[in-house]
């Protein structure tokens, strides 16, 4: 047997620093929204993405936002303010369910886009 194979020599291997770092937990990341419209638009973009309807998504968000009643817009704005201090994912989901369940008279655009994803 070859004498070199009896006593192996371990050589140091240089590894990139990224392999030694631990992965960050993505679930604890919270997003801070500047105002209610930005929060509403981000949620609606996710819904439109799931439904596969991306044609003019930002324009649709704006139209829907302006057709919402004042108290609904105020609720989204308060949630956006609250996002500066705590995680608001649970409250956002609750507000979305309320919006889905409401049938707003005269807001055909809103009903059309929301009913697609239900």
From Swiss-Prot:
DNA-binding region, residues: 29-97
Keywords assigned by UniProt, alphabetized: DNA-binding, Nucleus, Stress response, Transcription, Transcription regulation
Keyword S-adenosyl-L-methionine: no
GO molecular function: DNA binding; transcription coactivator activity
BP GO annotations: induction of conjugation with cellular fusion; mating type determination; positive regulation of induction of conjugation with cellular fusion; positive regulation of meiotic cell cycle; positive regulation of transcription by RNA polymerase II
SUPFAM superfamilies the record matches: HMG-box
Induction annotation: By nitrogen starvation.
GO cellular component: nucleus
Protein localization: Nucleus
Source domain of life: Eukaryota
Purpose: Mating type proteins are sequence specific DNA-binding proteins that act as master switches in yeast differentiation by controlling gene expression in a cell type-specific fashion. Required for conjugation and efficient meiosis.
Note: There are three genetic loci for mating type genes in S.pombe, mat1, mat2-P and mat3-M. Cell type is determined by the alternate allele present in mat1, either P (plus) in a h+ or M (minus) in a h- cell. Mat2-P and mat3-M serve as donor of information that is transposed to mat1 during a switch of mating type.
Protein name (record): Mating-type P-specific polypeptide Pc
Species this protein is from: Schizosaccharomyces pombe (Fission yeast)
Gene of this entry: mat2-Pc
């Amino acid at each position: 047997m070859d004498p070199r194979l009896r006593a192996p020599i371990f050589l140091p291997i240089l590894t990139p620093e990224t392999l030694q770092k631990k992965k960050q937990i993505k679930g604890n990341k919270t997003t801070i929204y500047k105002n209610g419209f930005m929060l509403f638009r981000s949620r609606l973009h996710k819904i439109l993405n799931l439904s596969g309807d991306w044609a003019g998504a930002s324009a649709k968000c704006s139209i829907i936002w302006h057709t919402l009643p004042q108290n609904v817009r105020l609720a989204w704005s308060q949630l956006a303010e609250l996002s500066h201090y705590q995680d608001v994912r649970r409250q956002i989901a609750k507000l979305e369910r309320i919006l889905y369940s409401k049938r707003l008279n005269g807001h055909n655009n809103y009903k059309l886009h929301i009913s697609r994803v239900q």
